[in-house]
């Protein structure tokens, strides 16, 4: 009974929309779902990074790894915006393509993530990330088709990907490699979240629109 009352405002909103607004309503839902998924994925990436850091990485190694050349992420090798101000200067299609590039660069590495941490504190988090990443990928592909006349063109940089996580957690080099990968994953998911929020905010005026 309660669910029926909850649907009424939505149905009334669609009923009183102009034809253009009715066409935009599904697009609003697509953006909303994508933003929610990106926020959740970014939070999961941050949680697993913190858990890994706390469990495996001494304080002195944390500082040295952040200044290491190996800490440079793939997203920094392509012309992707670094923050919301730069993102606002790009078109929606560009931001969607950058988002898709970043997501697809993690598809292969994240297939092994749960095996790497199968006996650790972060297993419960890592086991869900791959599935959620695929969900977000599908959502962004759908958005791109809606906005870019149904035929998204794949840029050359989409073929690049990160290395896979190392399963040998007793090796210092392997630990630091995984630590660097998790840092990049967190950074890249934050960028995807920012891009999607920028697009949604400038397409749909909302009182709670924050970046």
UniProtKB/Swiss-Prot annotation:
Single GO term (MF): growth hormone receptor binding
Cleaved signal peptide residues: 1-23
Binding annotation for Zn(2+): 40, 193
Keyword Zinc: yes
Keyword check for GTP-binding: no
Pfam families: Hormone_1
Superkingdom of the source species: Eukaryota
Entry's Gene Ontology BP terms: animal organ development; growth hormone receptor signaling pathway; positive regulation of growth; positive regulation of receptor signaling pathway via JAK-STAT; response to nutrient levels
A GO CC term attached to the entry: extracellular space
Disulphide bonds in the chain: 73-184, 201-209
Keywords on record: Disulfide bond, Hormone, Metal-binding, Secreted, Signal, Zinc
Subcellular localization, as worded in the UniProt entry: Secreted
Alphabetical list of InterPro entries matching this protein: 4_helix_cytokine-like_core, Somatotropin, Somatotropin/Prolactin, Somatotropin_CS
Function: Growth hormone plays an important role in growth control and is involved in the regulation of several anabolic processes. Implicated as an osmoregulatory substance important for seawater adaptation.
Entry's family note: Belongs to the somatotropin/prolactin family.
Protein name from the UniProt record: Somatotropin
Organism the protein comes from: Lepisosteus osseus (Long-nosed gar)
């Amino acid at each position: 009974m309660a669910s029926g009352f909850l649907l009424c405002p939505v149905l009334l909103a669609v009923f009183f929309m102009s034809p253009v607004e009715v066409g935009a309503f599904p697009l609003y839902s697509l953006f909303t779902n994508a933003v929610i998924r990106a926020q959740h994925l970014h939070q999961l990436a941050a949680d697993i990074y913190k858990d890994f850091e706390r469990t495996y990485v001494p304080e002195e190694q944390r500082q040295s790894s952040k200044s290491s050349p190996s800490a440079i992420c793939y997203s920094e090798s392509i012309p992707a915006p670094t923050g919301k101000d730069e993102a606002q200067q790009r078109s929606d299609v560009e931001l969607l393509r950058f988002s898709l590039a970043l997501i697809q660069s993690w598809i292969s590495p994240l297939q092994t993530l749960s095996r790497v941490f199968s006996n650790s504190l972060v297993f419960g988090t890592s086991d869900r990330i791959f599935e959620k990443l695929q969900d977000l990928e599908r959502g962004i592909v759908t958005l791109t088709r809606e906005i870019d006349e149904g035929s998204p063109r794949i840029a050359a940089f989409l073929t690049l990907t990160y290395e896979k996580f190392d399963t040998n957690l007793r090796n210092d080099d392997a630990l630091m490699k995984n630590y660097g990968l998790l840092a990049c994953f967190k950074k890249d998911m934050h960028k995807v979240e920012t891009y999607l929020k920028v697009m949604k905010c400038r397409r749909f005026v909302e009182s709670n629109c924050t970046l």
